[in-house]
Amino acid sequence: MKKNNKLIDVPNINSSEARVKKLIYKVEDNLFNSLYKSSSKSEYLCICSGGTTSSCARDGLITLDLRKEYNQIHLEKERNLIKIGGGVIMKDLMNFLENHNKTFPIGLSKLTGAGYVLTGGISPLSRRYGLAIDNIESIKGYLGNGKFISLKKNNLNSDQKLIWEGLKGAAPFLAIITEIGLKTFQSYPIQIVEGFINDDELSMIINLAEEFPNNLSLQWIYAEGIYIYVFAEIKNDLDQEITKQYFKKFEKFTSLKIKNYENYNQINFFPKELELFELNKNNHSEVISLLGGDLKNNIQSFVKCMKEIIHDKPNRSCYVASQQLGGKIKEYDPKSSFFIHRKSTWKPWIYAAWKKNDTKERESVLNWMYESWEKLKIYFPKIHLAQIHNHLNSHEEEVYLSFGERLGELKTLKNICDPESILPPL
């Protein structure tokens, strides 16, 4: 059999080195026909919107790369609405919005694509503006059965309502999304307190953060050291006063510094210059994202647990980081989307990396990831399915912990929208 050399140029190293069966760039009718006739039921279509996940390309499978043909951006300024193609990366969206003094709650990375939005979308701005999916106004694309859809939030019939909810949080299992209409927001200045801290200081800062107003949020990384960002949006004089009061509490942490930014787009979180962890372009990696509520009286035991996890990490490239939820996110009806864990306060994620082609290290690193997840379950029992791991043994458990009591509905939706399972399996 002839060796297949088709490669896809994406940020994720696992995917960029996958020997894909075929690369396609546009959704056409014959795409669905050929997939329906596929002789192997283990085959499915991989979708690349930004290329930051390990599931956007797999050996021997077809990848649909949306970045070339679906990269349009159109702002309807009078409606505070922006329409983006399914292949637009967040960096391009934010650069475009910055030129119009607008913003959107993107995450800590600007490399992600529309998949970030469709799987939930947790941002430092989410405590004030909700998740990315909470700000979707319209969706266009193709269900797995080949049917074209054009849905508008305020014009849904009873049949479309469940599909709309499913696409907000579980789209990768149901459809190929080619356009999303998003609500945009006026851009405001940002103040950040950032710096390296120790274990005891992390405990104190998490305790402070669980009382934050909605314009503040905490993000941290625990790698070779601990680095934090306390993020504050300054919309008006009241924000300024509240932020000043809270930032005063951080003066006792002498390693922390205040930085000012004109807008959210100017911030670069966890830059490589800080050397927080070893960034190796020859590494393969996996990420698992957890969800849980306030830590409250468990903060110190959690930080102790984190210290043990980091002590046991198999190399300098692995780490654990976290974002803060809450605020506006909790106000939405859990049934408004398939991101059901609305009461969550924290989203930690475990980043596990190993040298490519080193099967022994891969096994060791994945064992560390699963053992760390097991230790953290007591604090963060749920999952945010930001990456699909149907190539790993944990996939079914991740799906269950992500969709919970709505998993039955999702399976029904899957049977309706993607009966031949041409998209990733549940």
Residue ranges and their predicted role:
Residues M1-L426:
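Soluble FAD-dependent oxygen oxidases
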